Amino acid sequence: LCRNVNFDLKRAEGYRNFCTNLLIATRFVLMNVEGKDCGVGATANEPMQFSFVDKWIISEFERTVKEVTTAYEDYRLDNAANAIYSFVWNQYCDWYVELSKVQLRGSEAEQRATRHTLVTVLEAVLRLAHPIIPFITEELWQKVSVTAGVRKSDEDAFLMLQTYPTFDAMKVDADAVARMTTIQAQIDSIRNLRSEMKLPPSQKMPLLISGPEAECAAAAPYLQQLARLESVTHVEDLQQAAQGSVAPVAIVGDSKLMLKVEIDVKAERERLSKEAARLAGEVKKCQSKLGNERFVSKAPAAVVDTEKKRLAEFTALLAKVEEQLDKLPAE
C-alpha cells in the first residue's frame, strides 16, 4: 500500500539527536571495554556472572529484533525505525548504560559479563539499524566490531556484509524482565516522591525500603545509582521505622519506599495548606462548570470530557495533600 509521509523538520531533529545519543553510548562503551577482557575471543570460556540486568537487556534486544522483522515483513519501515529508536534510546541508553555503571564496580566475573553485554549488544544493534542509518552505523561498527570479537584488527570487513540479527527465543529471560520491570517502577516511584516533596534531583537523600530482604538488597545499588540516593536501608516494618515522619510512602509490588527527610513542620503545613486551598479552588471551578446545564449541553463532548478529567485529577491531588496534612504532627 502507498503511504504519503509528510517531511517533518522536528522529527528530523529528533533523529539527529538519536544518532548523537548512539554516538555518545558508543564512546561510553569503548571507554569501558577497549583493552579489557570482554569475554570474547581467547577469553570466551572465562567465567562470566551475568546479572538479571544483563539478561534483561538481551531479552529486550531479542524482542526488538522480532518487532523489526515483523515490520519489514509488513513493509512498514516506519515501525522498524520506531522499534530500533525505542530500544536504543529508552532501554539501552537510558537504562542499561546507567545500570552498567553499578556492575562495572562489581567482581571481575560481573565486570567481564557487563563489558561483554555492553559491547555485544551494541554491535548487534548497529547491524540491526544498518539498513535504516547505514553511514553512522558503518563508522561506529568499524570501531566496535574488533572489541566485540566479530573481526580481527587487521581484517578488512564491512558492516553491510555481516549477518543480519534474527530472533532467538532462547535468549529471552522472562524472570529477568519481570525483575527489571519492578526495579524501573521503584526508581520511577522514588523520582515521583522527590517531585511530590519538591526535592531537587541533585539532592541525594537516604531511602528506607521494606519488602523481601534478598530482593531489596539486590535492587539497592541500582536504586542508589539511578535515583541519586545517599543510601538505601532495608527495614522490616516501614510504618514503625517512619514513625513521626510525614514523608509520603510509595508502594511497588511487595515493597514500600520512603525518602528519609527532615521536615520543618510549620513551613510544610503552610505549604500544604496553600496547595490544598489552590486545589480546592480548582475543584470548585470544575464543579461549577459541570453543574452548569448550558455548558454541558452546548459544549463539545471532548471539552466536557476534559473538564471531567480535570475534576478527577484535582480531586485526587486534593485528597493526597489533605492526607499529608493529616500526617503532620501537632506543633
Outline where the language-model segments fall:
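Feature 926 captures the class I aminoacyl-tRNA synthetase adenylation module centered on the KMSKS loop
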Residues: 3-331
